[in-house]
UniProtKB/Swiss-Prot annotation:
Role summary: Digests double-stranded RNA. Involved in the processing of primary rRNA transcript to yield the immediate precursors to the large and small rRNAs (23S and 16S). Processes some mRNAs, and tRNAs when they are encoded in the rRNA operon. Processes pre-crRNA and tracrRNA of type II CRISPR loci if present in the organism.
Organism the protein comes from: Listeria innocua serovar 6a (strain ATCC BAA-680 / CLIP 11262)
Protein name: Ribonuclease 3
Chain's gene name: rnc
Coiled coil stretches, renumbered: none
Top EC class, one word: hydrolase
Assigned EC number: 3.1.26.3
PANTHER family: RIBONUCLEASE 3, RIBONUCLEASE III
Swiss-Prot/TrEMBL cofactor(s): Mg(2+)
Subunit-level organization: Homodimer.
């Protein structure tokens, strides 16, 4: 089994055009050193993969969070498709071992360079889309990205207090108040408890290491209550 057969087995998809898969993992430095081989670098596939990734992640967020405001979905998507996240995804599926680099780039540590790994992940998405279609891209993301979204890995990018305000004020003017109920623990490791009150009714309680975190936690609880009635 060669490395490209191994890679296809690893990702769970067979490529009709294996050259497309190889191109996705070909850095421009490799092309510069192998001009006689008529190989192409992955930059065009990266361009396409970036767009496909934005679309598929946007679609997933749109359906998973039906009450989330556009601004919050935009922030969450940005956190998912940013370079550090893409590097994490690429490392999870061991993409670095398959990258084709020029000797100079290899010596310079290119195989572990974050920007390069992020680009490779996007170019793979582009190649997978061209060869297998959007449905197979979604299946791949269901293994690599969507479980992290489901686990709440990117919810810290969301301002729950603002989101709660947008939800409850859609149809009427309301008064939203936050109360700090108390604090526990020693001075160096305190925890605060908070509650959110909407028009005199307690909708949520939460705790956190700071007063702001406790209020955000209370707002998140209130949102869950409102959206799962």
């Amino acid at each position: 089994m060669n490395q490209w057969e191994e890679l296809q087995e690893s990702v769970g998809f067979d490529f009709q055009n294996v050259e497309l898969l190889q191109q996705a993992f070909t850095h421009s430095s490799y092309v510069n050193e192998h001009r006689r081989e008529n190989v192409k670098d992955n930059e065009r596939l990266e361009f396409l993969g970036d767009a496909v990734l934005e679309l598929t992640v946007s679609d997933y967020l749109f359906n998973k969070y039906p009450d989330m405001a556009e601004g919050h979905m935009t922030k969450m998507r940005a956190a998912i498709v940013c370079e550090p996240s893409l590097v994490e995804f690429a490392e999870a599926v061991h993409f670095s071992k398959y990258v084709r680099l020029g000797k100079g780039e290899e010596k310079a540590g290119g195989r572990t360079r974050p920007a390069l790994l992020a680009d490779v992940f996007e170019s793979f998405i582009g190649a997978l889309y061209l060869d297998n279609g959007i449905d197979k891209v979604v299946k791949f993301l269901e293994r690599v990205i969507f479980p992290k979204i489901d686990a709440g890995a990117y919810l810290q990018t969301v301002d729950y207090k603002t989101q709660l305000q947008e939800i409850v004020q859609r149809d009427r003017d309301v008064l939203i108040e936050y109360d700090i109920l108390g604090e526990t623990g020693p001075a160096h490791n305190k925890a605060f408890d908070a509650q959110v009150i909407v028009n005199g009714q307690v909708l949520g309680k939460g705790s956190g290491r700071t007063k702001k975190q406790a209020e955000q936690s209370a707002a998140q609880f209130a949102i869950n209550q409102l959206t799962h009635r």
